[in-house]
Amino acid sequence: MLLAVLGSMGTLAQAQVSDAAPKFVERMADRALLERVRQGGYVLYLRHGTTDNSRADQVPLGDFKDCSRQRVLNEEGRQLAVQVGQFIRQARIPVSQVLHSPLCRARDTAQLAFAQQPGGLQQVDGLLYTANLTQAEKQPVLKVTRQWLSEPVSRGSNRVIVAHAPNMADLIGYFVHPEGTVVIVQPQGQGQFAYVASIPPKLWPSLLAP
């Protein structure tokens, strides 16, 4: 009897494991994908540059422009932001729109990476960092994040979103790492999008090599 009970418990445990959501699998971009991105129609979700982890965001943030209350880019992060922008231009990836979170680290990354962007940059307050929010507070932020990830992009151009790792983790279980990583997404409309691949900073040189 005891063996039968233990056996049924084991079967139940296996069923629970099999019913669990599949673990997210990160894929690295290759040159073939880069060629497709040059044709446009994608969203590039860029996690901000390297930050000073000795400074945590103060909650509530209050004024988004007050960088003294936020975790901000360090010098390495500022250089990384410039470098990622250069990589994107060297890859001849057309960018028609750059949106960024209102937090200083995302805003500064966008300004450093896309300083010469035609039409300028657009701050979207709804792209807030979600890690410090309650589940109820997260919902409108995730709705906005999903909206811009899923909104179709015209052929011949791409949309860039400069934001945070927790937002993507909340949406698809993918905590974007390291900082400065570009996540390539295929927007599908009506709130739907598909993860395609990632480009961490160290991958760019091999993608761009002759």
Language model: regions and residue ranges:
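Active-site-proximal alpha-helix that buttresses catalytic centers in soluble enzyme cores
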Residues: 16-125, 130-133, 174-184, 188-210
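A short, acidic, amphipathic alpha-helical segment used as a generic capping/interface helix at domain edges
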Residues: 143-153
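Bacterial N-terminal signal peptides
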Residues: 1-8
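Glycine-rich phosphate-binding loop signature in dinucleotide/nucleotide-binding domains
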Residues: 91-93, 152-156
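Short, surface-exposed amphipathic charged segments that create phosphate/polyanion-binding patches used
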Residues: 135-143
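Generic beta-sheet signal
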Residues: 41-43, 154-163
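Sec/Tat signal peptide C-region and signal peptidase I cleavage site
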Residues: 11-15
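Histidine-centered catalytic micro-motifs
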Residues: 46-51, 161-168
